[in-house]
Amino acid sequence: MSEQHDDLVNISMPKSNYQKTPASLDVMDVEQAVRDRYGAAAQAAESALCCPVDYDARYLKIIPAEIIERDYGCGDPSKHIQAGETVLDLGSGGGKICYIGAQVVGSEGHVIGVDRNDDMLDLARKYQDQIADSLGYANVEFRKG
């Protein structure tokens, strides 16, 4: 297929920042590039990394600003989960969705965040105890995967 799809560029990235990937770039280079990009994003906020989402403000009150500023998620699943459920967040990043989910599922539920990036996992785990203290229960865990 030799069709060109320049109109299918990630909408979160200004077209001027878009670079075509060389055909010779192998899978391991791409995986390393993703790890590097999200590792850097765990250290300093990157506004063009993903799509902005409006979250329910009541769930954001206990989440530290550092996590909110470094959230690169593309959706808010809080309307689709219920008290007592177990939630799995793949690509959990800094943990924002996990900490929102922790509030929705309550003390009887459980949230598991999985990310492949050590820097993002470090950011998510950094505030685990503080958030558990705010909630009055600990129901979130983060795993590498």
Role assignments for model-derived ranges:
Residues 33, 76, 96:
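Short Gly/charged-rich anion-binding patches and loops
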Residues 50-86, 100-104:
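Conserved alpha-helix/loop element of class I SAM-dependent methyltransferases that forms part
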Residues 86-90, 94-145:
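Class I SAM-dependent methyltransferase SAM/SAH-binding core
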